[in-house]
Amino acid sequence: MAAVAVLRNDSLQAFLQDRTPSASPDLGKHSPLALLAATCSRIGQPGAAAPPDFLQVPYDPALGSPSRLFHPWTADMPAHSPGALPPPHPSLGLTPQKTHLQPSFGAAHELPLTPPADPSYPYEFSPVKMLPSSMAALPASCAPAYVPYAAQAALPPGYSNLLPPPPPPPPPPTCRQLSPNPAPDDLPWWSIPQAGAGPGASGVPGSGLSGACAGAPHAPRFPASAAAAAAAAAALQRGLVLGPSDFAQYQSQIAALLQTKAPLAATARRCRRCRCPNCQAAGGAPEAEPGKKKQHVCHVPGCGKVYGKTSHLKAHLRWHTGERPFVCNWLFCGKSFTRSDELQRHLRTHTGEKRFACPECGKRFMRSDHLAKHVKTHQNKKLKVAEAGVKREDARDL
């Protein structure tokens, strides 16, 4: 039978007897509160042997509810029993005959990953207080990006000066101006300036543009060959630069060439704009009547309509081909039209705009043809009134 240790103190026994449901003083020693007090007083005391002020009393299982709460260790309990708990660790100083609420784990049990609720180290060596000192021990060459939480965490007032100062931002890459070098006064305006010989030159001889971002890693590197650069610059000068005498020699020829090419270019542009048979036939021959207005004829067989503007002919050709490039973008409409003015007229049906007003009565209309039809009604009324007046005068004369 298991044995439990009960404290002999008379004051504690009297305290427990007053709070037990049983009025018998003999049963007070076996009450659940007595067992709980004895167990709690035994926790944490070193020593394998029980002190002399403890008495070995038998445990009565007839108490009922305590038997379901406490499972004391016994010496005769088999080690392979599934309900048996492992023996306590020798370092705790407990024997199997003593009751313990918290079972002791073996030496091979893994430690918990979280620290205990009541740590044994003082506050000076806690992880919270060691954080500023560990950050101060970081080398100065370490970039702030390696410790992202150190730069943003709130520190105690006394540890703000332990952080290393942030490194200064890197200077922006120095870019040279991408503009042509100023030409000297003695060179003519049509000559190409000399290429810069400095290290910031772009490497293209005769370009006159400086290199872009000398410190940029992606800038192209050209071989610094002075002989090749000089030879290329000389060849470029001989091919492109015209001196004053050369320019005066070719100036008349250039002017004559420009004058002869101008009418040809205008004729070619005119032929490209209109593809009607009339324009194609008159493209190479001079016009018979210079003052006559150009007419554009539809080339579709059987049509032969004539228009005074190319845009009108193009709109007419869309009617033949069925092309409708002008689409209404109103919600749930999507109608397409051949001409843009048809689309604008259709949009007024959505917006309700009436831009055409009658000068006689002020009535407004969406379309101009509706207004013209309405104006005719006013004219007809005037004619009727005039006719009625003439008839009256004729009747008076009779």
UniProtKB/Swiss-Prot annotation:
Principal location listed in the UniProt entry: nucleus
Disulfide bonds: none
Zinc finger (C2H2-type): 296-320, 326-350, 356-378
GO cellular component: chromatin; nucleus
Subcellular location: Nucleus
Function according to Swiss-Prot or TrEMBL: Binds to GC boxes promoters elements. Probable transcriptional activator that has a role in the coordination of changes in transcription required to generate pattern in the developing embryo.
Span list, region Disordered: 160-204
Protein name: Transcription factor Sp5
Motif (9aaTAD) on chain: 187-195
Superkingdom of source: Eukaryota
Skewed-composition ranges (Pro residues): 163-174
Domain remark text: The 9aaTAD motif is a transactivation domain present in a large number of yeast and animal transcription factors.
Keywords of the record: Activator, DNA-binding, Metal-binding, Nucleus, Repeat, Transcription, Transcription regulation, Zinc, Zinc-finger
Family, similarity comment: Belongs to the Sp1 C2H2-type zinc-finger protein family.
Record-level GO BP terms: bone morphogenesis; post-anal tail morphogenesis; regulation of transcription by RNA polymerase II
